[in-house]
A protein has these predicted regions:
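Structural motif
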Residues: 52-79, 196-217
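Hydrophobic alpha-helical segments within soluble ligand-binding/sensing domains
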Residues: 63, 130-160, 207, 257, ...
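Venus flytrap/periplasmic-binding-protein-like
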Residues: 104-117, 225-270, 279
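Hinge/cleft segment of the Venus flytrap/periplasmic-binding protein
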Residues: 166-167, 283-357
Length: 357
């Protein structure tokens, strides 16, 4: 009788939900970081995860303060896992804070930089489990290749094509890799010259200023590549203010799936757009769900880089805006990506393109 009571109590006992905190480096009103958080919330709902999101508003001290606040909580109130992006190489300061509190950590969106002296996951910082990076180099490469193809079609007899570039920053690993992809595409095209490259810290106003200077020095560029949509819009504003009388604006390519960027692509104001990487945090939750349920991702590599980017056209942009209106990603079944819930899965497949078919 006592055994039956014990078994019954175990059966009806509530399962303790995973508690995950996401330290979002971006601004709450930024379309990209808002979409990233919304996708994570949809994944958390599917997987029974309690998700806590805080925004650093692109301020490094706020990011560090948020980590310190989590670490200072009583042991029973701390999250099981913390996800953060290694923007501006902040991981070197975040890891000691969180690891010292015994909190498991995971880098998403931007992992360890090749020149960062933080060691490898699970070594110096033993609670740092790993990272998931979108293949940022792929995003830069795809958009620049598309620009080059369109520049050749627009001026087939030019012989030489000028490319300008506005990157995010020279420190954040994902920013560096996006620019690497842009440069690789330019190098492969023997008829393209990258005539100037600047940084605008992902900021629209700063990009507008930088682009204005670029257009003074290079009055008739064929193409302009920007590391994110906000900087692309800044470049568009700069051209509209200074250079409309010169004739055709440069073909502009960028990265991110904000409504404004997708609409600009559909209207032809953007020539090239890649995206899908905002899903990285949601997929990180899938990996951590599996880790918590006994299926460690380490067999696939602790630092994973996945080709999640897709190149959009007007049709796929329209489909995206229709299916995910209002950044509502609840129609995605995130449980299907879990190796715990789908034992036949041998590896993770997080490509974004199939979601629009």
């Amino acid at each position: 009788m006592k055994l039956a009571i014990v078994i019954g109590c175990l059966w009806i006992a509530p399962v303790m939900a995973m508690n995950v905190a996401f330290l979002n480096y971006g601004k709450k009103e930024e379309a990209y970081w808002h979409s990233a958080s919304r996708a994570m919330q949809a994944a958390a709902a599917d997987l029974g995860i309690k998700l806590e999101v805080s925004y650093a508003e692109r301020k490094q001290q706020r990011m560090l303060a948020a980590a310190q606040a989590l670490a200072a909580r009583p042991a029973g109130k701390r999250p099981d896992y913390v996800i953060f992006s290694n923007d501006f190489a902040l991981g070197a300061e975040l890891l000691p804070i969180l690891d010292g509190a015994g909190i498991k950590t995971f880098m998403a969106f931007s992992g360890r930089g090749s020149d960062q002296d933080i060691g490898l996951p699970r070594q110096r910082y033993r609670h740092w489990l790993g990272s998931l990076d979108p293949d940022a180099e792929q995003g830069g490469y795809l958009t620049t290749k598309a620009l080059i193809q369109q520049a050749r079609a627009r001026r087939p007899d030019a012989g030489k094509y000028e490319l300008l570039a506005i990157g995010g920053d020279p420190v954040t690993p994902s920013s560096v890799r996006r620019s690497d992809g842009m440069r690789r595409a330019a190098r492969e095209a023997k008829d393209v010259e990258l005539v100037s490259e600047v940084y605008a810290a992902w900021d629209q106003a700063r990009a507008q200023q930088q682009a204005g200077w670029l257009f003074q020095r290079h009055p008739a560029p064929d193409m302009l590549w920007a590391g994110n949509d906000l900087m692309a819009f800044g470049a568009m504003q700069a051209w509209a203010e200074c250079c409309v009388a010169r004739g055709q604006p440069p073909l502009i390519g960028t990265i991110n799936t904000s409504d404004q960027a997708l609409q600009a692509l559909a209207e032809g104001r953007l020539a090239a757009l890649a995206g899908g990487h905002f899903m990285t945090g949601a997929m990180a939750l899938v990996m951590l769900y599996d880790h918590a349920h006994g299926k460690d991702f380490a067999d696939l590599g602790m630092e994973q880089v996945l080709p999640v980017f897709m190149l959009f056209d007007a049709r796929s942009a329209g489909r995206f805006m229709q299916r995910f209106k209002g950044a509502d990603f609840s129609s995605i079944n995130f449980r299907r990506y879990s190796r715990v819930l789908n034992p036949a899965l041998k590896q993770y497949s997080f490509a974004f393109g199939p979601l629009l078919r």
